[in-house]
Amino acid sequence: MGHTKNTGNQTPEDLQVNIPTRDFIRLHRNDDVRILAFSAGKNPEVDVPFALDQIKGWQTARHKLPLWASTEGIIYPPHLNMEQCSSEQTARYKQKVLASYYQGDDAADCACQSSHVKRTDKSVGEGAAWTVDGVLMDLTGGFGVDFSFLSRCFTKSVYVERNASLCRIARHNFGLMGLSNVEVVNSDGIDLLKELSADNTFLMTGVGSRLPLFIYLDPARRDVNGKKVYNIADCEPDVVSLVPLLLSMADKVMIKLSPMFDWREAVRELPGVSDVHIVSVRNECKELLVVLSGKPDELRKNGFRIHCVNDDDDFTFVFGGEETSLLGECQGSIDGSVLLVPNASVMKAGCFSELALRFGVSAISVNSHLFLSSHTLENFPGRQFCVVAVSSMNKKELKRNLAGITKANIAVRNFPMTVDALRKRLKIKDGGDIYIFATTVYNDSHVLIITKKIV
């Protein structure tokens, strides 16, 4: 994330790391930094604070940013910046979104014509297998993870960050990663954009045509005191007030928001929304991406797309501005059915009617957000379970249906007890291959649906 406080940064001003410090980092990068902090002071030539930052950074990157972790010589920023940066998986997803705009079905809707798109000899693993003869501007550079993937798609890319230390780190790392045609600017992104808006010759080609501009922002979601903010307008920079400027300059604008934000509020406050991407990794909602286009009136009329993404699953639908509530409830037997549990992105979107219509399934009840099918479904965005028994909360029924079950995974949906309270009442330990869903059915009865996982 751009615009973060860079507290505790121990990075040398010139990024030159002496040999003892470099060797110490390499030797101990798999060790516990808490223990190292007490034992590392034995060698006076080792820059211990810097070394510990690098070891912690690499340990985070090993899982979050494997490409970076495998690149020798990468300099990592303080822990806060590492926590806030995108993962490699979500950064690659943003790159995939770009592909849809500039070379996919959406290319006709973008100011970038096909003549601007060129094939390259890169593999998908290295980055984009194509480039746009255009400009990327990341106005809130931060550690530069998203920039490192998006910049591979453009012939020119500009990373803007007002923290001088992060700029030095970015310049160093981009060189190691083989990123060419990138410019690192130590400035406030919005101030720079305002300057360029007065004279946008930087987008003009030698023959007088205009290059497409793609702007990316990741506004800080904390105030000056470090407290989280919960309104889009309270983020820094305030993207709501900046929309006219952004759309006057760019053909497309991508804004990364907290997954805690309501996408409906984002659409209300940000004119020109063409796409909303709710991005989850391993069923945990990580990012809310909002893409703006320079045609707000047309988009309001025709609606926009909502992409519910979880790893390789992508459930996309067009939202016309009105919620549909045509959700049919199952009023028959649940036994023997397939229980469908939507993934985190679908849950965040709240698009349950669209889901039911697309797959022809019934809801257990309007507010339970669990669905039933007579068979397994291909490409369903979520998990699927075989229902082996259904029990009321009657003691005798519970005893009969739970006989022999000592361990189970328990979830509650629209149910008057917490997981812990229910587990205590049922006297069942956590784990095993049984999944119990406690919920409320169409007639307001509380039931336990006992299942085994299929997908």
List where the protein language model places each region.
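SAM-dependent transferase fold signal centered on methyltransferase-like domains
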Residues: M1-V455
